[in-house]
Amino acid sequence: MSRGRRPQQAASGYDCVVVGAGPVGLALAMAAAEEGSRVLLVDAGNLRSGKRDIPRDASFRTEITDPLRHADASLTTRRGVGGTSWLWGGRCVTLEPIDFEPRDYVPRSDWPIRLDDVTPWLEQAARYIDCGSAVFRSSRPDWDGLSEITMSNLERWARQPKLARGLGARVLAHPRVTAMLDSRLVDLEMADDGSIAGLVVERGGERTTLHGDAYVLAMGGLEVTRVLLDVQSRHPHLFGGVDGPLGRYYMGHATGSIADIVLTDAARAADLDFERDEHDTYIRRRFTLTPEAQRRHRVLNTSFYLDNPPFYEHTHRHPTLSAVFLGIAIAPIGRILLAEGIRLRHVGPRPYRVGAHVRNILRRPWQAAVDVIDILLRRYASPVRKPGFILHNAGGRYSLHYHAEQLPNPDSRVVRTVGDDGTPVLRVDYRYLEGDVDSLLRCHELLDAELQAAGLGRLEYRASDEDGVRALAWEQATDGFHSIGTTRMSARPDEGVADGDCRVHGVANLYIASTSLLPTSAEANPTFFAAALAVRLAHHLSAHARRTERTGRSDSAERSDAVGAAAD
């Protein structure tokens, strides 16, 4: 590894050039290096830049059409080693077989691959992301009486989500990895045969062209899309053409809470709390609908989990929640403890009812002190970071949080325009559909019906009628953290940007490793699965590199055939 190598010294001789040192790029670089490939890892940031907001770039700007629906880039992206893991909560969830299937009620839902194509690489991704294991099913039985609802789906949590110190350090120390940091990708050079001739990067005001056998764009979803849109502006026939799929089908998730869950037996809440498994990793069971129920009721994949009441609602009267609220409401303290996007969600809208929260603390100050110390020790002083906490109560009442799939929508998109001053603009027009909310409300109804029929509990909505509940769901419909779909996989080039091997359609040696590849959003947070796709891609590319080394051939046509046929 060499971090200090001058650009002209690091310009050629690599099996794989990876742009982006976030979770997905790091996983790809490590997997490829462990397979024997020579990897050049390029990132616009450095070892420390992920700790702060990305400085404004005079070469382009981003405009968000509806800020109520999409978070600002300062809350969702970072540059440098570790990338957006500096802001990541660490939740790891895999996709399910139904997520890959064509569903007639979900347009453009067919993937060019199936879960079985990625399963062999899940364990390796879990090792890199540090979530203990690729076991995502609980062996514990569901509660008696549940049939369309299951509790077997697990979410796992990275022991330490900020990956720069762990995976990042190992990647940079690997002898087969050369890192070029503080090097911004500015262009893709096209060869006469339509392949990539090289990547142009700028470092310290100096431009240089990097050469490798394969090039992988492993930045965040919007950044990968921006780069390809920029190239398409000069080569309109690429990536499906200017009216094609590039930038369309932008998805994330619907997430929030519109109801409380009231358990008949308050002790059952422990079944849905965080726990450490045999891998010394935190896991949590969740409510999800079985695949059969999803098909029968024609609903999108949706998960539910227990949560505390909103910290900012002083009416919870809980001293610990109020103490936590007051701590994170002080911005300099809260930003140390939480990523800013998460902090803002917990502190809620102004005005803050500080006096009411102080009175809550004074009811039982010793409980607040003991609980807060325990939370701080388990979350910030432990080698295995506890991702959250649930304060149990004798009434069995908890906030019910949802995380729901979105419908693929071609009008939810990002486009490249040019401002009046000539600066390229990435315009983000992120949208939800009424169908997203319809499915979400129906899933709540199905969960409520099963709980009541089995005598296990009930849901109590936070609005008095259906219109009010729907309005609450729309109020919370916002994302921008999960950039899915804008370079979607597809079997045909007119339906997507990349094929099932993550290779860009029509460009033999250009690949994508990003959450933007996913054609559907499922209910799963996308980071872990994108890392697994990257590990799979690394094995494909490394197999081709070994074959090329044996035969001495590396032309683009051979690469296109060889990688497409690499070991599945």
Predicted regions and their residues:
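Conserved redox-cofactor binding core of oxidoreductases
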Residues: 104-198, 476
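FAD cofactor-binding and catalytic pocket of flavoenzymes
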Residues: 243-246, 255, 259-423, 480-483, ...
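Glycine-rich loop(s) and the adjacent beta-strand/alpha-helix scaffold that form part
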Residues: 34, 47-48, 202-277, 514, ...
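N-terminal Rossmann-like FAD-binding beta1-loop-alpha1 element of flavoenzymes
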Residues: 14-41
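Extreme N-terminal leader/targeting segments of oxidoreductases
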Residues: 1-16, 34-35, 543-553, 559-564
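Glycine-rich Rossmann-fold phosphate-binding loop(s) that bind the pyrophosphate
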Residues: 19-23, 44, 219, 515
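Redox-cofactor-proximal catalytic regions of oxidoreductases
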Residues: 60-135, 407-417
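A glycine-rich dinucleotide-binding beta-alpha-beta segment and adjacent secondary-structure elements
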Residues: 180-191, 378-414, 426-520
